[in-house]
């Protein structure tokens, strides 16, 4: 199914919670959300890419990892946004190029659009951790004065 997302300004937390609630209905895994990001600090472009990247990583954990627990953590510190999606699933070998499939490339593309860095940590039997880090733009920080 295709998932289209449009966000109104200031609704990041609600959109994220709604999307994860929808996905939780498709799995027995427990999805835990800790969102400390203020919607005010995110523009609509950032919100869409963040929610979609989190969605893709969560779907990967549900479909491929056989995870029982998925943790989503969103935080901002000194102008740096960090989003972590971690699961306790089967994990995979990062050197297995067959696993560099469509979903991973979409997440990399979204990270690039945010001018951020996407790190994936995993090993067979060790679950998976996806970490996106990016710097808030200077223009946005000036608007908050």
Regions found by a protein language model. Name each.
Residues 1-145:
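Coiled-coil dimerization/phosphotransfer module
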């Amino acid at each position: 199914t295709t998932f289209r997302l449009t966000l109104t300004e200031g609704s990041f937390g609600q959109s994220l919670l709604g999307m994860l609630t929808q996905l939780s209905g498709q799995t027995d895994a427990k999805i835990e959300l800790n969102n400390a990001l203020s919607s005010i600090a995110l523009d609509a472009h950032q919100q869409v890419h963040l929610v979609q990247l989190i969605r893709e990583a969560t779907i990967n954990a549900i479909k491929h990892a056989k995870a029982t627990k998925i943790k989503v953590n969103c935080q901002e510190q000194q102008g740096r946004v960090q989003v972590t999606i971690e699961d306790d699933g089967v994990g995979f070998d990062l050197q297995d190029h067959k696993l560099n499939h469509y979903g991973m490339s979409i997440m990399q593309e979204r990270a690039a659009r945010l001018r951020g860095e996407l790190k994936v940590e995993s090993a067979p039997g060790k679950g998976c951790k996806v970490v996106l880090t990016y710097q808030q733009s200077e223009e946005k920080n000036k608007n908050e004065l």
